[in-house]
Amino acid sequence: MNIWHDLQPDLVRREEYTVFTANSMGSTARLSFDGDAGLLCLDHLSDSNIGAPNNTGFLPRTCTEDGLPIETILLCSQPLPAMTLVRCRPVGLIALHLEDGGTCNYIISAACADEFWSACLTVDEIPTATRKAIVRYLRYDQQLVRRPVSATEFCGLEQAEKYFDACQQNYLLRYCGKIPPQS
């Protein structure tokens, strides 16, 4: 089974979707997704004490411009093991503007089963300390792979949904041979 392709399509909708987790909250190991194998692989280990402030994961049946599933920051009160399936809904998006002119986007997702975070409806409701920790972690992570970040931007639910829709259409075109309808 390849989790990227074999998850039922109705479990991946823009308003609620299943995330498969990668990096556990607090971990200094950075796991990345191997699309061919459908598994996680160790990308690098952080030699500092900057661990993931939140769980991270990937959205099946989506495809970014890099040819990989959407990465997500998963707002959840507890660390979750890698490859756990979690029902989530989008809260917003964080865009990392890279010094080389590129952009790296992450959808910010709230775990539906988490009483605290499921009440968070917008990025504005994420506590400032949590937002700062996310930015610090993502900047450090990009620095480790030699992609320095020049600016970060928190965007609302509408931007997250547009990004999700574009990546889902890209997936359908690339892997299912479906041409998206013109709007």
Residue ranges of model-derived segments:
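Hydrophobic N-terminal alpha-helices or hydrophobic patches in metabolic proteins across all domains
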Residues: M1-S183
